[in-house]
Amino acid sequence: VMNVKVAPNIRVGFIVGAGDQVPTALEQLGAKLDFIEPNDLAWGDLSRYDVIMTGVRAYERRKDLRAYNRRLLDFAERGGTVIVQYNKMEFNQAQYGPYPARVGAGRVTDENAPVKVLVPDHPVFTFPNTIGESTWRGWVQERGLYFLGEKDPKYVDLLQMEDPFPDNPGVKLGSLVEARTGKGRWLYVGLGLWRQVPAEVEGAYQLLANLISLPKAPK
């Protein structure tokens, strides 16, 4: 049994991309989950959600998301939390984040690569689960890929990590990035949580729980 806490009564709207098991994990965590279909995205009431999350590569797969992305930015400005899982270069065809940003080729392929938390008092690392060394143990395949690259200074990097071998040198940023916008927040997650969830990696569930709990985090 995993030791993972989640804030109560979190409503998540999920925009399916290429397909991942994160929605199942969110339901296991106790979130109230709806799948956001094209009509919902165009004119449905998004204010009933605490969090809107996009599946992996959703900007490539979902024409409606590209067309109605402004609705996600409005949702964040009004106090919502938007969580965007990794995208490929399709994300760079327009400005889909609240400020200019581009997905780059940044990745960390060693699943045990050391991770440094850059903003330790950020609620994503403290509420309701405390993120520490053990969070990063037992990962599979990689830490993440298609990190956010060039970006407006209003985006804040929350993590840095570094592959321990010479063919991918240097500290990598862009794996977990937040921008505050209006009353809410917009986050980009290049971390491969979608890859860890089927492998039942407890640390990934803790991070996922903290991400969706952000709207209820103590101010």
Q: Over which residues does each language-model region extend?
A:
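Alpha-helical scaffolding within the catalytic cores
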Residues: 38-42, 67-70, 170-176
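Catalytic beta-strand/loop cores that center a nucleophilic Ser/Cys/Thr
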Residues: 102-201
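A glycine-rich, often tryptophan-bearing local segment used as a flexible ligand/cofactor-contacting loop or short
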Residues: 57-140
